């Protein structure tokens, strides 16, 4: 399996999910290691979703203890459908394989609050050790 960086981001800390199996692997590994996951569901054609990429990357750079995933709803429809994504962008905070928070829309301040609060409340301090084959 290969981790792909988001287009336009040089040293991205955001992992682009290419298929459902990758999603399951990343979420399971993060959960097993006690790390939260923040997932950005968007689309390449959605301007508001694209406008959040920079802020999402910035959060990933400042919170290495959290696994940040990007899911294109057109590429990984099964995961988008399973989580009930109906608008882009949609952001999920996942802990222990369960959705604990959801934000719909391009609201960078709310996403930052969610990420900052999750880092504090989960007390995680080390980055997740994701194994990629």
From Swiss-Prot:
A Pfam entry, by short name: Thioredoxin
Source taxon at top rank: Eukaryota
InterPro entries linked: Thioredoxin-like_sf, Thioredoxin_domain, Thioredoxin_H-type-like
Gene3D superfamilies (alphabetical): Glutaredoxin
Residue pairs linked by disulfide bridges in the UniProt entry: none
Domain Thioredoxin: 1-120
Family from the record: Belongs to the thioredoxin family.
Name of the protein in its database record: Thioredoxin-like protein CXXS1
The organism of origin for this protein: Oryza sativa subsp. japonica
